[in-house]
Amino acid sequence: MTTILRIDSSIKGEAAVSRRLTQRILDRLLEAHPDATVVSRDLAQGIRQIDGPWLGSVFTAPEQRTADQQEIARTAGAVMAEVKEADILVIALPVYNFGAPAQLKSWVDHIARRGESFVYTETGPVGLLTGKRAIVAFTSDGTPLGSELDHASGWLRQVLGFVGITDVDFVAADRMVFGADEAMARAEAAVAALAA
């Protein structure tokens, strides 16, 4: 059975264009995988930013963790498990000031962990999350996908590839202030063309 992990990250909640787009992508995937399990995480509802206590918790042996460290490690482990168990990731990438939202960066910090999602070898790093697909819903008011102003999509593609997820597609509703209807029409066409 297919497991789809949906990651929303906009602070606009239900009003977010990226959320509408992740829902359309999810609907398209469910047409092809009607029995899929869908796991959803809304990062705007809160995800811990990594800090000293987080680092100390996830890299301390389980039997040596304090009660506080056990709770932090449990939450961090749940975020990692969602990604490991997913076959397909649907990720909202709304662009804020030319980059990714802070909460999406925090999620990436949770999943890019040595020994969990990648290892270092004599020839360099090797991603461990292979065999997965990611579909990214890229939205922006004025930043074109892939332009020199876009510091979000290349970063996310790089991070996903680093952990082993190299099958990455982008669906863009970009430059919304220059024609929201046209941008959404292009995005809808891209969703319809997705190989589910």
Swiss-Prot record:
Pfam families: Flavodoxin_2. Its cofactor is FMN. Binds 1 FMN per subunit. Its EC number is 1.6.5.-, 1.7.1.17. The keyword NADP does not apply. It is an enzyme of class 1 (oxidoreductase). InterPro entries: Flavodoxin_fold, Flavoprotein-like_sf, FMN-dep_NADH:Q_OxRdtase_AzoR1, NADH:quinone_OxRdtase_FMN_depd. One of its GO terms (molecular function) is oxidoreductase activity, acting on NAD(P)H as acceptor. The keyword Ribonucleoprotein does not apply. It catalyses: 2 a quinone + NADH + H(+) = 2 a 1,4-benzosemiquinone + NAD(+); N,N-dimethyl-1,4-phenylenediamine + anthranilate + 2 NAD(+) = 2-(4-dimethylaminophenyl)diazenylbenzoate + 2 NADH + 2 H(+). Belongs to the azoreductase type 1 family. Quinone reductase that provides resistance to thiol-specific stress caused by electrophilic quinones. This is FMN-dependent NADH:quinone oxidoreductase. It comes from Cereibacter sphaeroides (strain ATCC 17023 / DSM 158 / JCM 6121 / CCUG 31486 / LMG 2827 / NBRC 12203 / NCIMB 8253 / ATH 2.4.1.). The gene is azoR.
